[in-house]
């Protein structure tokens, strides 16, 4: 993001799972969801403010604050809700012929990340994290795990300005197809929890990363 231009910003969505009512029907404690978004926004907020990051859905803007966590929160109790929420954010469905550009999806756990990946696949997005950084190799991953080297994922830098189509050009249709091909590229998808079920998606590049922490300390 530091190398991103406001003329060609990164398109990012935040998927924050939060059920406003618990199993007993009473209001759920929002402390955890608020804390998660506060951490996310402490990093992303400055980029949104400078126009280097935008939300395709408009749920987050340059004037958003950490108090706007509810705008990206949704009930993720059912898998179909995760998928429909993402499709709605992108303004797409399975019959949409053109793709909405999405560079990153901040999924706050591996459960959400998994179904976000499934929905992107259903919508026709293609590729994987390996396309974002082709320098990542199996041997490099093994060396990283064994402590022989540090492996850093770095994306190929975007041009300073987003490509524009010229309606007066005879090649407008070709340009449009080329732009849609770019827009349909697989985004970075983050997760959390190191769920066993998420490992295949990380191995095949559909999920960028996961994380875990020792809560006993």
Where do the PLM segments sit?
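A residue-level marker of the well-folded mature domains of exported/periplasmic proteins
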Residues: 1-217
